[in-house]
Amino acid sequence: MKIQLRDIFEPLSANHMAKVDLWFVMSLIAILALGIVMVASASISVSESIHNTPYFFMGRQILYLILGVSFGFMMLQIPTQNLQKWGILLMLLSLVLLVLVLVPGIGKTVNGSRRWINLIVFNLQASEVAKVCMVVYVSGYLVRRAERVRENLIGFALPLFLTSLFLIFLLMEPDFGASVVLIGTVIALLFIGGAPVYQFIAIVIMAVLVMAGLALSESYRVKRLMNFVDPWADPFNDGYQLSQALIAYGRGEWFGLGLGNSVQKLSYLPEAHTDFVFSIWVEEMGLLGGVVLLSLFALMLSRIFKIGHRALMGARPFAGYMCFGFAILILAQVIINVGVNTGFLPTKGLTLPLISYGGSSLIITLGSLFVVARVDIENKLASKGGESEERKRKSDESIDDGEALA
């Protein structure tokens, strides 16, 4: 069967794109702008030492942003019903990527983890693709098998079985942080899709026990747990990264040292422009700056949840579940990243979405957010169409009444 571009894309006009939720767009733009600023500031020292220029990573991040927006506009032209049709294919494709990343010569190893596939322009992190594709697949599954999920244990367990297959490959990389985010998002979607509460509680308990067992199965994870409990017990070795992050918070106090004035980014805090960029942000902009950034995330996520809710109420369940899934993915990563940065959670290799340096995370996250924008546009078009039909129906009724009176 020949597939043409018009079978995949349904371009939107400028008038349609102007209908996207303004608060969602403005909060996203603000977060992206702060992300570029913080990557530029936090990466100065490491950029100088590695590339002999202070703004190498900022330049790369701007390139990733351009690629992400371009990819996002492409996703914006795809009707959500097409994504629903391709859910199984996308899930299988992401599974193939997780397998490929483990193949020597294809997968790229960084800091002891084999998580990336070199695409020349940037390194593709397979787990980022897998998380988004699983949201698309599970959203479609909840529509196709709605009754089974609500009434049948097998219907509830099937997506969890597929997720466990993903987790096996993720843990082989290893990528424990992505595993936690993925299983948490899938469980949350099943609950939103109507899974019985007792099944939901049982699977949450099981997931917690499994993750706890996995956390204790590797010596480096046990060390991270011990450092999380008391980083000051060994502040110059295993507890070094967290203790330096906490020092950054102490320096920042309420109002911060000022943009660009961080001390911890000067080779004291490892991964200052990636996993621990939030610590540098608070050091420079203070606790109030941290609250502002988290408030922007809260605003953006609340609008995504609202868009998803409108889709569900408008009899568009796939689009609604997908929005909820994307929002939960981002929310989980924000909570874990900030929790790690502040010492409330054990150290994991998770970036702060849209803020931390990195191509895969930024490009894939922007792609998912442009899909949310498509859902919002389709919601409004469907609502307008419904209103037109209602007006036409009332007009026809009035004509019929007039003819009856005549």
Swiss-Prot record:
Pathway(s) this gene product operates in, as recorded in its UniProt entry: Cell wall biogenesis; peptidoglycan biosynthesis
Transmembrane segments: 22-42, 56-76, 86-106, 116-136, 153-173, 186-206, 280-300, 318-338, 352-372
Gene Ontology CC: one annotated term: plasma membrane
Organism domain of life: Bacteria
Catalytic function, reaction form: [GlcNAc-(1->4)-Mur2Ac(oyl-L-Ala-gamma-D-Glu-L-Lys-D-Ala-D-Ala)](n)-di-trans,octa-cis-undecaprenyl diphosphate + beta-D-GlcNAc-(1->4)-Mur2Ac(oyl-L-Ala-gamma-D-Glu-L-Lys-D-Ala-D-Ala)-di-trans,octa-cis-undecaprenyl diphosphate = [GlcNAc-(1->4)-Mur2Ac(oyl-L-Ala-gamma-D-Glu-L-Lys-D-Ala-D-Ala)](n+1)-di-trans,octa-cis-undecaprenyl diphosphate + di-trans,octa-cis-undecaprenyl diphosphate + H(+)
Membrane topology of the entry: Multi-pass membrane protein
InterPro entries in alphabetical order: FtsW (IPR013437), FtsW/RodA (IPR001182)
Main location: membrane
Keyword Kinase appears in the UniProt entry: no
Biased composition (Basic and acidic residues): 383-397
Cysteines paired by S-S bonds: none
Protein's cellular compartments: Cell inner membrane
GO MF annotation list: lipid-linked peptidoglycan transporter activity; peptidoglycan glycosyltransferase activity
Keywords of the record: Cell cycle, Cell division, Cell inner membrane, Cell membrane, Cell shape, Cell wall biogenesis/degradation, Glycosyltransferase, Membrane, Peptidoglycan synthesis, Transferase, Transmembrane, Transmembrane helix
Function: Peptidoglycan polymerase that is essential for cell division.
Family, similarity comment: Belongs to the SEDS family. FtsW subfamily.
Protein name: Probable peptidoglycan glycosyltransferase FtsW
Organism per entry: Marinomonas mediterranea (strain ATCC 700492 / JCM 21426 / NBRC 103028 / MMB-1)
